[in-house]
């Protein structure tokens, strides 16, 4: 007798979310001679797609992915698109783990919170890095505290047994405000950064 074993499961339909922004600005500045001029230009337009809840019903681990590109709406040449984010990962009740081109927690949770003058270059604050390829990121939230970490392994360090760069931030809400503390270590330059 030949027996067949059938596995019954119900696959969750992954949620696919397309998104984008058209960001254009009109500014009035002065040149180096003090002469006023107006300029109309792209200010960071983007398009992307996010995929969440890739998994099987009842599973405690699900998948996710994101692909986002910057769109230079003023470009008449061949550099219209610029890679922003491109990653895949797994999510569980312990946290999420992802690999690819991702944003830096130090910038997301500390430096990026004070970048209020984006029109003029966002020079009001210092950011360690905004996005990096060749990265592995882990995030988890427990008891109101969120831990975000990223490690970059791009082969540029002479220390072959370690990450080339890594960061960690701990964040929470206090009296309605986001509070974060973070550490970033650039192994290549042998420089460490702290931020609050």
Language-model features: where?
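Outer-membrane beta-barrel proteins
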Residues: 1-196
């Amino acid at each position: 007798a030949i027996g067949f074993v059938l596995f019954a499961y119900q696959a969750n339909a992954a949620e696919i979310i397309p998104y984008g922004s058209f960001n254009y600005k009109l500014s009035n500045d002065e040149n180096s001679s003090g002469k006023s001029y107006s300029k109309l230009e792209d200010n960071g337009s983007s398009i992307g797609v996010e995929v969440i809840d890739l998994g099987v019903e009842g599973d405690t681990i699900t998948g996710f992915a994101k692909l986002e590109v910057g769109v230079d709406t003023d470009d008449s040449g061949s550099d219209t698109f610029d890679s922003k984010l491109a990653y895949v990962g797994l999510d569980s009740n312990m946290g999420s783990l992802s690999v690819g081109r991702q944003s830096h927690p130090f910038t997301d949770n500390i430096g990026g919170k004070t970048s209020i003058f984006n029109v003029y270059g966002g020079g009001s604050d210092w950011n360690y890095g905004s996005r990096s390829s060749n990265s592995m990121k882990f995030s988890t939230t427990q008891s109101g505290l969120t831990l975000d970490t990223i490690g970059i392994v791009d082969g540029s360090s002479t220390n072959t047994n370690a990450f080339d760069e890594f960061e960690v931030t701990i964040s929470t809400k206090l009296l309605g405000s986001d509070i974060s503390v973070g550490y970033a270590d650039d192994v290549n330059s042998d420089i460490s950064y702290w931020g609050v």
